[in-house]
Amino acid sequence: MIGRLRGNLLEKQPPELLIEVSGIGYEVQMPMSCFYELPEVGSEAIIYTHYVVREDAQLLYGFNTKNERALFREVIKANGVGPKLGLAILSGMTAAQFVQSVEREDISTLVKLPGVGKKTAERLVVEMKDRLKGWGAGDLFTPATDAAPMDDGSEFITSPQSAVDEAVSALIALGYKPQQASKTVSQIAKPDMTSEVLIRESLKSMI
């Protein structure tokens, strides 16, 4: 079981990163709400991981804190919600927003997430509302992600078309349909926007 990685951050290709630990490179998928808080490429990073073994693959999902990982594990306990959908849910909104939506039984907001239909949204509310009651909201998310302005994403691709392409690819990887991803990014894109900003603003607009 791989629960924590500490090493050199080699690549950032949202929503995936590559981190080198003792000469071994680990590919890790991370919710965008956590991805925004990663240090620059070349810096040391500490990532808490959830390890998934399937017949055809071994996958790592990464988080900045143990509590973010704990919330992810609660989300994927819900009937019909696997790691891929859990990743999309916690990319489409911050952990605090998700908890608030569940507590308020806000089905209309939850169904805007990729892969979440009305039945899945209702299951999330029914199955998670009681489980989340004992959690303090401040323990469920990285404060900087939910409350503070993001950095400028200077280590991300800055060429206008490359930034657009990377943003579209990231949204598709999170479960959005190609046409929806392309249309949303195109509507938001400006010449000076980095791919990180494009991804973040696109996700906001779809929620």
Swiss-Prot record:
Segments of this protein annotated with the region Domain III: 159-207
Organism: Aliivibrio fischeri (strain ATCC 700601 / ES114) (Vibrio fischeri)
Gene that specifies this protein: ruvA
Keyword DNA repair attributed: yes
One cellular component term from this protein's GO annotations in UniProt: Holliday junction helicase complex
Highest taxon in the source lineage: Bacteria
Residue segments, region Domain I: 1-64
Family under the similarity heading: Belongs to the RuvA family.
Record note on quaternary structure: Homotetramer. Forms an RuvA(8)-RuvB(12)-Holliday junction (HJ) complex. HJ DNA is sandwiched between 2 RuvA tetramers; dsDNA enters through RuvA and exits via RuvB. An RuvB hexamer assembles on each DNA strand where it exits the tetramer. Each RuvB hexamer is contacted by two RuvA subunits (via domain III) on 2 adjacent RuvB subunits; this complex drives branch migration. In the full resolvosome a probable DNA-RuvA(4)-RuvB(12)-RuvC(2) complex forms which resolves the HJ.
GO molecular function: ATP binding; four-way junction DNA binding; four-way junction helicase activity
CDD domains found in the cross-reference section: UBA_RuvA_C
Name under which the protein is recorded: Holliday junction branch migration complex subunit RuvA
Swiss-Prot/TrEMBL keywords: Cytoplasm, DNA damage, DNA recombination, DNA repair, DNA-binding
Regions annotated as coiled coil: none
Main localization of the protein described in the UniProt heading: cytoplasm
InterPro entries registered for this protein in UniProt: DNA_helicase_Holl-junc_RuvA_I (IPR013849), Hlx-hairpin-Hlx_DNA-bd_motif (IPR003583), NA-bd_OB-fold (IPR012340), RuvA (IPR000085), RuvA_2-like (IPR010994), RuvA_C (IPR011114), RuvA_C_sf (IPR036267)
Domain notes: Has three domains with a flexible linker between the domains II and III and assumes an 'L' shape. Domain III is highly mobile and contacts RuvB.
Function: The RuvA-RuvB-RuvC complex processes Holliday junction (HJ) DNA during genetic recombination and DNA repair, while the RuvA-RuvB complex plays an important role in the rescue of blocked DNA replication forks via replication fork reversal (RFR). RuvA specifically binds to HJ cruciform DNA, conferring on it an open structure. The RuvB hexamer acts as an ATP-dependent pump, pulling dsDNA into and through the RuvAB complex. HJ branch migration allows RuvC to scan DNA until it finds its consensus sequence, where it cleaves and resolves the cruciform DNA.
Localization per record: Cytoplasm
BP GO terms, sorted: DNA recombination; DNA repair
Region ranges (Flexible linker): 144-158
Region of interest (Domain II), residue spans: 65-143
